[in-house]
Amino acid sequence: AYMAFPLPGTPQLIAPSNVGPYYAKAAPRAATVEELHVIVRQFGEAAHRFQQAGGDGVEIQCAHAHGLLGGFLTPLYNKRADEYGGDINGRLRLTLEVIEEVRKMCGEDFIIDVRISGDEYSDGGLTLNDMIYVSKQLEKAGVDFIHVSGGNTIKRGSSMPAPGTAPAPHAHSSE
């Protein structure tokens, strides 16, 4: 799920907003800014534990409106009016803070890969142009790789062409 339990004993799932996916049994509540600070630290600590265990790097999942970071990035789930919502820069803020924390905890030689959807293929979702901008911001933040896929978990099959679709319907994404 794109939602998370930020702290042990948290009774309700949190998300960017109180908007949940179609498969959620109950609506989440919007994460507080204080919880987001804890989550950023937890990402850094988890990456550091992996590094201490011999790992060379991590992939941070922001694709498919899946996972907490993917939920924050998409306008389909993120309805916040604070610094973690609104325009693309606000919605990207949490991911950039996570990248910064991982770098701080693990150093410059630790590999950071970020997975994004190149296009969510959903009305009102992230577009190719949005994700070109996001990719440039991730590069500025010092990520080593950007893993691009497509679609989202909101509209099942959003990245799968309908039967009878002309060949290579997503070829425009490679230009």
Language-model-detected regions and their locations in the chain:
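Flavin-dependent oxidoreductase catalytic cores
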Residues: 1-175
